[in-house]
Amino acid sequence: MLKKRVEEALNAQINAEIWSAHFFLAISLHFAENGYPGFAARMKYQHQEEHRHALRLMDYVIEQGGKVELQDIMDIPSDFGDPVESFEQVLVHLMRITD
C-alpha cells in the first residue's frame, strides 16, 4: 500500500505527463495542419512517449494498491506560431517539466 503523500505525488506526476502528452499532440497537429510533416511526426512521437510515462505510473499506482486520480486537462495552447516560435514553446515546456 502506498503512503498517502507518495500516492499524491505520483498522481501529480501522472497528471503532468498527461498534460505534457496533450501539449505535444496539439503542437503535432499544428505542424501537420501547416505543412510540416516531419516536425509533426516528431511531436507525435513525443506525445506517445509522455503518454507511455503516464500509463507506466498508473500501472504502478494500481499495482501498489493505490488510486489514480485524473484531473481535467486545461490550458493547452492552441496558437503556436511559426516553426521557430513553436519550438521556443517546446523548449520552455521541456525546461519546466525537467526542472
What annotation goes with each model-predicted range?
Residues M1-D99:
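Iron-associated oxidoreductase/ferritin-like identity signal
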